Amino acid sequence: MNIITVVVTLVSALIGLVLGYFAISLKMKSAKETAELTLLNAEQEASNVRGRAEEQAEVILKTAERDRQTLKKELLLEAKEEARKYREEIAEEFKSERQELKQIESRLTERATSLDRKDDNLTNKEKTLEQKEQSLTDKAKHIDEREQEVVKLEEQKALELERVAALSQEEAKEIILTDTRDKLTHEIATRIKEAEREVKERSDKMAKDLLAQAMQRISGEYVAEQTITSVHLPDDAMKGRIIGREGRNIRTFESLTGIDVIIDDTPEVVVLSGFDPIRREIARMTMETLLQDGRIHPARIEELVEKHRVEMDNRIREYGEAAAYEVGAPNLHPDLIKIMGRLHFRTSYGQNVLRHSIEVAKLAGVLAAELGENVNLARRAGFLHDVGKAIDREVDGSHVEIGTELAKKYKENPIVINAIASHHGDVEATSTIAVIVAAADALSAARPGSRRESMEAYIKRLQDLEEIANSFEGIKQSYAIQAGREIRIIVHPNKVTDDQITILAHDVREKIENNLDYPGNIKITVIRETRATDVAK
């Protein structure tokens, strides 16, 4: 290898190094420019993103502020509305409490007045009892003195009879006994008259005062009993549609309702007859709906009967609730309320039993207030006293027995149970409220126009009254007058003395009370008439 070759090689290597250096420098410069451009672009993009983020953040903040203001306004409005409602509720409660306080104050004032009046009555009664006790003491002393006189007179008379008439002791005894019996009969009759007069004056006045105060605050109704209901038809052609082909419609109607459908020659009228007023009312509503609807066939009849039966159950419950509210009998068992509602469709001697129960409850409340008893308990007992009549056609036993069992079943107060059991005298009354309920029941039933009897029962009662009067000795004739409110008895004057007619009136009264059931009172009048006649010639 010569020097030239070495030089060429070195020069080539040097040139290659220089070219490589320049290439690397260019690449590094290009990479730097690219990096700077990328960095610039990144910074610009970051600036743009930051700007957009700031704008979005500002929008979000504005939206949040607007939502916050809206929510704040809504919350303020809701708070104001709730505050207004709360103020109204508080005002209503205050108003209700003020009314209750006024009512309580009024009742307390009435109670205080009643207590003052009762205190005065008790004071007067104490004075009357003291006077009566003194009078009885004087009478007892007088009787003892008279008895001693009678004994002395009997001894003297016995001696005189034996001495003067030469009678035996037995004959003398018979004369003395007869004479003494006549005197004692006269004495007893006189004392009975005096006692009757005193008791009648006091009892009549007290009873009239109590009953007058009770009756003037209670308004009664005149109600008539019905066993048929008439339904008006738009035209007589509807009668054929009611009967249906081969009588299918009318048979379906009668079998589902238990009510007889009477279709006769009376124009534009169909009569529903049945003794169960609830079934009769369901039948009436069904018939009227069928006539209005026009679709009369067995399936439609069955559908409407079931529909109106449900409606009737609701009506019965509403009647019971309204009656309980009217008399002020709270917390009654729901089943008991429904049973009481059935009484709206029950009558007794033509009197609606539910209205009668309401009337008895009000009368019992008035009488209880006058006598210082529990008014609410008396009203409750009076309201429930005839509850047994609602189901006495479905359950065996008298309405008193059924009502007593119902009251026990629904855990009524023992005083209420006894009032129900004793209001017809079947059981002894163990409380004043029971006696009050019996009196209110009799008062409601006996007021004019409240009840009516069937002609057969009315005639039977008059006949029984005359038979009782004629069962005594010495009766010439008796007449039941004033619709059975009075019995006049005419006696034989040679068999009954003036003193004996008072005792006879008492005996007749006791027998009537023990053997007859009757509304109100019956006056017994005994008449003894002696006539003397002669003929002037």
From Swiss-Prot:
One GO BP annotation of this record: mRNA catabolic process
Topology in membrane: Single-pass membrane protein
Keywords: Cell membrane, Endonuclease, Hydrolase, Membrane, Nuclease, RNA-binding, Transmembrane, Transmembrane helix
Localization: Cell membrane
Stretches the record annotates as Disordered: 112-136
GO molecular function, one term: RNA binding
Domain of life: Bacteria
Domain HD residues, every copy: 353-446
The protein's name in its UniProt record: Ribonuclease Y
Organism: Streptococcus suis (strain 05ZYH33)
